[in-house]
Curated annotation (Swiss-Prot):
PANTHER family: CYTOCHROME P450, FAMILY 76, SUBFAMILY C, POLYPEPTIDE 5-RELATED (PTHR47950), GERANIOL 8-HYDROXYLASE-LIKE (PTHR47950:SF4). Pathway: Secondary metabolite biosynthesis; terpenoid biosynthesis. This is Carnosic acid synthase. Keywords: Heme, Iron, Membrane, Metal-binding, Monooxygenase, Oxidoreductase, Transmembrane, Transmembrane helix. Belongs to the cytochrome P450 family. The gene is CYP76AK8. The lineage of its organism: Eukaryota, Viridiplantae, Streptophyta, Embryophyta, Tracheophyta.
Length: 504
């Protein structure tokens, strides 16, 4: 048992033992009082210990016993875990407005981010509606993405050039770091028309610090926090989560603020030439009357985009390469398709994607087998409601266990096997309408950056597979292809994939 749990329990035991004992008895009955069934609860802590280090896997195992709508008591907090497409549809679509309020972890309520971030505002708020409209119409619409296609093509060329340098030197490439650099530079070029990181430089200096900030935020925002289970402990910050997130989030906010300030000064110059980037687009909007957009809102929105865009797509591409190296027959099929369609062309263009069905099937299977967000960002019930005949009290924390849904043998044939072929003759897509595959969420709170992430995932996988064969770094072959992951907002590979590119 971790030290913070021991200390926290010692602090609160005298206060709550008696009052919680009655809940222990009721919790053993499973589903009594109209609540969804769930595992027995211990006094005081409820089901906290059953989360374990990998909550997505622990909760999936519990759901096999207690069903696709399962209740838990996490300290003072009542929670419900959804583990089926039918229940996910009910929560995200049919009763989407009731469950559209995000659950904001205690540690993230820092620097005003929870009052401004689109990810943390209730969907019923005017600010959320405004920011969502900006993202949908100005940043991720088809015309906006078409206008920035050249930026993505250039980043794919840079990724190819870096892999070629590794090939010429006969050295292994850290696939996760290389794709992280690609996505980071893509995001900063798209947002600010600048490049932030260099390939192979994430072990030193500012590149290392930036990666630390992003990785820390995606990890700490997702891990269980005792201050959420017992809110009266939040001011004490027993795990130091608030302190850590204040530092890492503050560092990114300062970086973005400096870039915005530089642009504002440049725009005051009469000779300034507008750039084809999101910052100028949103600054123009902030000067108009249609959106009433503030500089502070732009800053926090960009930080959200950087965190989501840099880490999750890089992690998913790394998992794709792991699976393709584990399955040489699948790699061969993909390379044959790429050769047939692309020929001698080294960089896949987005217009090529529609002619690459096995590539799309491969990406879908990676998103099924390794969903970037194993537990979708939790929602909270804005009012008491009923789901499948069970009462869901107001403020219940709702988890959608995407990882469990994508490993369910009643939904997927051979779910533990990596089989892109399952999607070749299937209409199932990850756009939010097929609830057996919702890695980007669904309904009102579906990830607004999904169109960009989808394009880059397919293009990065195609670029790495079409131009190179791959050999694992000598001496650690068995560890390189292990599927052990690290839980957080994004599911990271525990042991990075390092492989030597060989020019085709």
């Amino acid at each position: 048992m971790q030290l913070f749990i021991i200390l926290s329990l010692a602090f609160i035991a005298a206060w709550v033992v008696y009052s919680r004992w009655s809940e222990y008895s009721r919790g053993r009955q499973g589903g009594s009082g109209g609540l969804p069934p769930g595992p027995p609860r211990l006094p005081i802590i409820g089901n906290i210990l059953q989360l374990g280090r990998d909550p997505h896997k622990s909760l999936a195992q519990l759901a096999k016993t207690y069903g696709p709508l399962m209740s838990l008591k996490l300290g003072n907090q009542f929670a419900v875990v959804v583990s089926s497409p039918e229940m996910a549809r009910e929560i995200l679509q049919k009763q989407g407005l009731i469950f559209s309020k995000p659950f904001t972890p205690s540690a993230v309520r820092v620097l005003g981010h929870n009052d401004i971030s689109m990810n943390m505002l209730p969907a019923s708020s005017d600010r959320w509606k405004k920011l969502r409209r900006v993202a949908r119409e100005q940043l991720f619409s088809n015309p906006a993405l078409q206008a920035t296609q050249d930026i993505r093509q250039e980043r794919l060329r840079q990724l190819t050039d870096y892999a070629s340098r590794c090939c010429a030197q006969g050295r292994a490439m850290n696939v996760g770091e290389a794709t992280f650099t690609t996505m980071t530079n893509l995001m900063f070029a798209t947002l600010f028309s600048v490049e932030l990181t260099q390939y192979g430089a994430t072990d030193t200096g500012s590149d290392k610090k930036f990666k630390e900030h992003v990785n820390a935020l995606t990890r700490y925002m997702g891990v269980p926090n005792v201050a959420d289970f017992f809110p009266f402990l939040a001011p004490l910050d027993p795990q130091g989560m608030r302190r850590k997130l204040t530092y890492h989030l503050g560092s990114l906010l300062e970086l973005v603020q400096s870039l915005i300030q530089q642009r504002l000064q440049a725009r005051n110059d009469s000779t300034y030439q507008k750039k084809n980037d999101f910052l100028d687009t949103l600054l123009d909007l902030s000067e108009g009357n249609e959106y009433d957009l503030s500089i502070k809102e732009i800053k926090h929105m960009f930080v959200d985009l950087i965190i989501a865009g840099s880490d999750t797509s890089a992690a998913t591409t790394e998992w794709a390469m792991v699976e393709l190296l584990l399955h040489p027959d699948k790699m061969a099929k993909l390379k044959a398709e790429l050769k047939s369609v692309l020929g001698e062309k080294s960089i896949v263009e987005e217009s090529d994607i529609s002619r690459l069905p096995y590539l799309l099937a491969t990406v879908k299977e990676v998103l099924r087998y390794h969903p970037a967000a194993p537990l979708l960002a939790p929602h909270a019930a804005e009012e008491e409601t009923q789901v499948s005949g069970y009462i869901i009290p107001k403020n219940t924390k709702m988890f959608i266990n995407v990882w469990s849904i994508t490993r369910d043998p009643s939904i997927w044939k051979n779910p533990e096997s990596f089989e892109p072929e399952r999607f070749l003759d299937s209409e199932i897509d990850f756009g939010g309408q097929h609830f057996e595959l919702i890695p980007f969420g669904s309904g009102r709170r579906i990830c607004p950056g999904m169109p960009l992430a989808s394009r880059m995932l397919q293009c990065m996988v195609a670029t790495l597979c079409h131009n190179f064969d791959w050999e694992l770094e000598k001496g650690a072959e068995s560890k390189q292809l292990q599927r052990e992951d690290v839980f957080g907002l994004a599911l990271q590979k525990k042991i990075p994939l390092r492989a030597v590119p060989i020019k085709v």
